[in-house]
Amino acid sequence: MELDALVPLAVTVAIFLLLVDLMHRRQRWAARYPPGPLPLPGLGNLLHVDFKNTPYCFDQLRRRFGNVFSLQLAWTPVVVLNGLAAVREALVTCGEDTADRPPVPINQVLGFGPRSQGVFLARYGPAWREQRRFSVSTLRNLGLGKKSLEQWVTEEAACLCAAFTDQAGRPFRPNSLLDKAVSNVIASLTYGRRFEYDDPRFLRLFDLTHEALKEESGFLREVLNAIPLLLRIPGLAGKVLRSQKAFLTQLDELLTEHRMTWDPAQPPRDLTEAFLAEMEKAKGNPESSFNEENLRMVVADLFSAGMVTTSTTLAWGLLLMILHPDVQRRVQQEIDDVIGQVRRPEMGDQARMPYTTAVIHEVQRFGDIVPLGVTHMTSRDIELQGFLIPKGTTLFTNLSSVLKDEAVWEKPFRFHPEHFLDAQGHFVKPEAFLPFSAGRRACLGEPLARMELFLFFTCLLQRFSFSVPAGQPRPSHHGVFAFLVTPSPYELCAVPR
């Protein structure tokens, strides 16, 4: 009898869930909603998406449904934008209406809240504007675009070259050393100090950063975001975000140490001290985003994004130099002609080095390290490429489809520096070069990244010739996706010139 009594309840629950599912699907029935694969009840298209290789999956769906297609991830409506026209229309033409970020329920476990969202994942509004303005102005005050910061980078490049010299021409993987060098530039900006390359906490921070990136692209994470009800299962979210929580704990320790040396009476030496000074001004203002919780989020954003993206691009650069020794020799010849082999490279040299500049840009295009950018969300109903996209829709901007658009690039799937040179050998930058995204949410660290890429790359090519180790097979030029696209593991030999 008890079992019989449960049957009506089960049927009622099933009907309720079906109605909820139908409510979330109703926009797909609109006349001009983008096409897409048929979603399953409850799960939507979660099983249609390969989260281990999302860029490839989206490319296959683009070929089937066109440059603007839709998905339903559980009950979350998603539209994927492909190609330069669709991406630019969304991010630039409709920039005000697509500048928001979708809520990420699982991030509440990390301390995200209305006034503690950092910069990159913050919702579009007063708190984001406040932190974006603060970050840009503080980086400028600390020397971005000036000789002072350029000197920090060139000194760190000298330390990196010394570490490469210590390898004595033996085969080694360069990734860890590149991580350390780039991280020290970020550490100088955020903590006012650099770390020795063998510092145990420094090494631990790298490990946690890379593990956290793997967590970002996990299937279970996407399920928890799509079905927030599952977050109520005790301990599940903490397990999924174990490395990200440990990363934030490590940053907290560094911030606590740094506060002990802060003198409010002195001008800020770094971003952390500038933030602490703003916190003092904002005391008693509950609406301010300058608070303890947001300090760790802002520093975490700058440290993780600023370190991993640039060091990964440099890793791609060295890989492509050993795969294309003719390009490497031509870069070195330009370095010798413009800079020589004695003095350190300077940003002022870049204007006289069109080929090296073209190579660096082609490394960014070919490496395509952030293929899907960061998700956006519509803040009102918009029309895009002839389709109607409702308010609250999550947008994926497929930057990979722009950087490797067959209609724009002569050889989209090959490493070809001439993409960025005109017939006279002058540097040119096509409109489809969007590795930093575009619009209101374009990467705020772009000027710093450009400086680091030029100075680190030219310093390394000035001092060393790179080659595939004798007896080893030619490394793969295919990347590995885990939110970022990193080169497949490889070794090289760095021989002093």
From Swiss-Prot:
Protein's cellular compartments: Endoplasmic reticulum membrane; Microsome membrane
Organism of origin: Macaca fascicularis (Crab-eating macaque)
A GO cellular component annotation in the UniProt record: endoplasmic reticulum membrane
Catalysed transformations (reactions): an organic molecule + reduced [NADPH--hemoprotein reductase] + O2 = an alcohol + oxidized [NADPH--hemoprotein reductase] + H2O + H(+)
Main location: endoplasmic reticulum
Family that this chain belongs to: Belongs to the cytochrome P450 family.
Membrane topology: Peripheral membrane protein
One Pfam family here: p450
Residues engaged in binding heme: C443
Record-listed E.C. numbers: 1.14.14.1
Protein name, UniProt field: Cytochrome P450 2D17
Gene3D superfamilies: Cytochrome P450
Family annotation (PROSITE patterns): CYTOCHROME_P450 (PS00086)
Enzyme class, broadest EC rank: oxidoreductase
Keywords: Endoplasmic reticulum, Heme, Iron, Membrane, Metal-binding, Microsome, Monooxygenase, Oxidoreductase
GO molecular-function terms, A-Z: heme binding; iron ion binding; oxidoreductase activity, acting on paired donors, with incorporation or reduction of molecular oxygen, reduced flavin or flavoprotein as one donor, and incorporation of one atom of oxygen
Cofactor annotation: heme
